[in-house]
Amino acid sequence: VHWSAEEKQLITGLWGKVNVAECGAEALARLLIVYPWTQRFFTSFGNLSSASAVLGNPNVRAHGKKVLTSFGEAVKNLDNIKNTFAQLSELHCDKLHVDPENFRLLGDILIIVLAGHFGKDFTPDCQAAWQKLVRAVAHALARKYH
């Protein structure tokens, strides 16, 4: 993936303001609520029976933070995203058997969460850069499936 200087600035500038715990928890919770079939990968998380149960679930919050923390590695390694996610791709493919489409869904939800948190600061140019990033991460995570 080729990044312009402007795209890199838009991504890193916004990332510096992201509350990883809050946005990560919200993104994963939204994934589980909006796309309930994704819950089958999280059966060990306990009660996911309703939106309020998912939103209040400490395991969802903790894993959401973990997911977005690892996403931060993409921000730090924009020029080497494939290698950054090689091990996670292997884990999600070989051991967890996660449908790679779920990576794309989570990326799209992250865009919604960022737009909600940053409002007018999440300009169309910023959104375009972040959309490119979430696609690159989803592609890197799906790499072991090909």
Curated annotation (Swiss-Prot):
The organism's taxonomic lineage, starting at the top: Eukaryota, Metazoa, Chordata, Craniata, Vertebrata
Domain Globin: 2-146
Organism this protein belongs to: Psittacula krameri
One BP term from GO: hydrogen peroxide catabolic process
Superkingdom of this protein's organism: Eukaryota
Expression by tissue: Red blood cells.
Pfam families, sorted: Globin
Annotated protein name in UniProt: Hemoglobin subunit beta
A GO MF term: heme binding
GO CC, one annotated term: hemoglobin complex
InterPro entries: Globin, Globin-like_sf, Globin/Proto, Hemoglobin_b, Hemoglobin_oxygen_transport
Function: Involved in oxygen transport from the lung to the various peripheral tissues.
